[in-house]
Amino acid sequence: MGRQLILFPMSDQSDHPLILLWHRRDLRLNDHLALAKARQKTAKIVGVFCLDNKILQAEDMAPARVAYLLGCLQSLQDHYQRLGSELLVFQADPVQLLPKLANTLGAHGVTWTLDTEPYAQKRDLAVAQALRERGLAIATEWDQLMHHPGEVLTQAGSPYTVYTPFWKNWSQLPKTSPVPTPKDLQGLTPAEKEKLAPLEPLAIPQLADLGFIWDQPLPLTPGEEAAEQRLDWFVAHGLEEYQQNRNFPALDGTSQLSAALKFGVISPRTLWQTTLEAWEQSRSEEARASIETWQQELAWREFYQHCLYSFPALAQGPYRSPFQEFPWEENQDHFQAWCEGRTGYPIIDAAMAQLNQTGWMHNRCRMIVASFLIKDLILNWQWGELYFMQTLYDGDLAANNGGWQWSASSGMDPKPLRIFNPHTQAQKFDPEGEYIRTWLPQLARFDTGDLLTGKLTPGSRRSVNYPEPIVDHNQQQREFKRRYQLVK
């Protein structure tokens, strides 16, 4: 698709000044490139969002993620109204809806921001074709990435498949500054709104209206304002200590902006600009090292997005072909125990409790539980990948797939065979047992050393109805290594 897909460029002069801004993973008006460019042509810009059943009814949809999405839509609609326009919401196929909507309103054209996911790319091409057939203008922008996939390439002109050289190139490229937010917009006239009735616009639905149940508070309040407030908090209290605190799940040491980035509630340009300002104000090498570490995490996100764009088959299975035939176990009981946090390993079960209760899990714990599923239970990493997508409120195809393939040593930028010992990980990253006690309160009274090493007596476990370990770590890691050598 390249940098931009402009099949019918938008002219500067038009008898039909209305432009529709089709939102997907860009649920904001601040620092929005497509909006800023459209505003140069007209003030009459109306937002559109399609609740797409192909996405909502997919097996990898998480109730918590839909809850966050709906909250972001409400925030976005409020922002449009403050500027004088509106966000139109439909439950419809965008390929069918957008041409009808544009024609009904006499719009000049439709603008949107591009996506790296395979489904989104196919959908966008179909929408563009349908709009072009009706003579409607189209403008698109890469806006969820600092650098689009065609911009960061090896000297041979091919996509990177290893992170470190990607980072070296990516970090040296000039970065675009945030773009201004329009001060005002114009919405539809009463007569135009009356024309919408046959297309059945919706009030933003409740979660239950879409068939989902989620009654827990979300880790991050939906919407632009909450994301910007969290960023401000993180810069003031967490960014300069990020390097030393980010791996300790009991600490509030990460930005927790992953869901906001997933849905484009905040722009990567805004985040990058914030890091530059923090760098200038920092007073120690340690602080600057932390800032650069967080910048590298932003680049990891883009690396996985670029990989998915360039190698869409990643979404279907292992990148490294030998792993297509890996002899996985098929033990459903072990998988259910992992999903439900009943493995008998406190750090694993605490992490899964956090995921199931909040829709979010600390990144260090994501690596620990992924390693356990793959290399202790010897279960197919794709089972875990799907379960994460079914539960994470920040679930992102590229990042989730990239993380799981990294853990399985089957994807891009594989590390040498690495098996996390859950007890060692607990001792290193939850040394006081605070995280375990938070999410497994039934174990709170036991000795910290026993919690971290899992050396709880059978009687202690029975007294709080906590299970025995479902596998022996040392035995299972030997077996995984044996199988790994067969397909390596």
Swiss-Prot record:
Residues 17-146 form the Photolyase/cryptochrome alpha/beta domain. Binds 1 FAD per subunit. DNA binds at R246, Q425. Keywords: Chromophore, DNA damage, DNA repair, DNA-binding, FAD, Flavoprotein, Lyase, Nucleotide-binding. Residues 297-304, 363-364 are annotated as: Interaction with DNA. It catalyses: cyclobutadipyrimidine (in DNA) = 2 pyrimidine residues (in DNA). It comes from the Bacteria. Its EC number is 4.1.99.3. The keyword Cell inner membrane does not apply. It is an enzyme of class 4 (lyase). Its cofactor is FAD; coenzyme F420-(gamma-Glu)n. The keyword Endoplasmic reticulum does not apply. FAD binds at Y242, T254, S255, Q256, L257, S258, D394, G395, D396. Pfam families: DNA_photolyase, FAD_binding_7. GO terms for biological process: DNA repair; response to light stimulus. Monomer. Belongs to the DNA photolyase class-1 family. Involved in repair of UV radiation-induced DNA damage. Exhibits specific, light-dependent repair activity for a cyclobutyl pyrimidine dimer by catalyzing the light-dependent monomerization (300-600 nm) of the dimers (in cis-syn configuration), which are formed between adjacent bases on the same DNA strand upon exposure to ultraviolet radiation. It has been shown that photorepair is more important than excision repair for UV-induced DNA lesions in Synechocystis. Its disruption does not affect circadian rhythm. This is Deoxyribodipyrimidine photo-lyase.
